[in-house]
Amino acid sequence: MITGYVFENGKLVEADDQEANTSPVLICTEPDQIEKKFIQTKFDLGIHTLQSILDENELPRIENRDNKIVVICKHPMHIGIIDRDIDSRVMSLGAVIYEDRLLFIFNEKISFKDFLFAPMRVEDIRDVLINVLHRTTLHFHEHLRCMSLAMEQLEEEVIETASSDQLMMLFSLGKSMTYYASALNGNNALIERIYNNTQKLGFNDIQKETLDDIRLDSAQCCQEAQITTTIMTKMTDARISLMGNNVSNLMKRLTIISIIMMPMNLIAGIGGMSEFTVFNEEYFKMPMAVSYPILFLFLGIVGFLTYKCLQKMYLL
């Protein structure tokens, strides 16, 4: 689907259907074969470049040749939880400047109006590109904040319940943070390259100052992602060690109980309840209400002595 936008009083306004294909700003989402042919013809795009833009694994980069500027950056998708797996993908967003026209291409269904209709004033297509880079950086920052809060909540749940579900979600969150850090590093390098070549790419001084602010925000966001990723990795390792230590302590207690019960089970197994009843009737002549409590007391004393022996042997 292709949607056109025109400039009006420092803002972008959606163009009519008749003017969509000739608008200075075009947005193409999930292009079909006909739209791909239109893009290749009107913006002189090769099939390889178009496939690179639509590839979600493509690294952020910029190309400037043949009077055409191609920018590929990363943009975060919506965060969701599917079967205890945190889904936070990163998509590729392509921008092409050719003959005073700007084309955005992406292979996902997302609302792009928040990028174009932001409070920032836009006078030409390069202002629009700067605005999109700025909004992408802010979007990453908001996602990092949400993921940090989710990490803290999952840590508390792991401590309280020690459930494998929460731990798997923590692993999934750590994987997403790794993808985010990689995407932010690529975007930061892209913005740095645009800033260092503003005159060559046709940006004016005011736009360069705006790019400088975006560059600082991107570097800060990139550093925040790296710090959060490092903390999450170390905290995840610590949680795993803590859970392993808890399991080891539990197994130690169960082993101690089994060892203490072993002599008692041995005595009860050799004698047996039926044999003890016959032995009591023939030799002790005591009522069962007296003989069995004495037997249980004896077994308890044996267990207590076993416990004390283990203590002296430094096994407890």
Language model features by range: what are they?
Residues 1-196, 203, 213, 217-220, ...:
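Peripheral, non-transmembrane regulatory/ligand-interaction domains of membrane transport proteins
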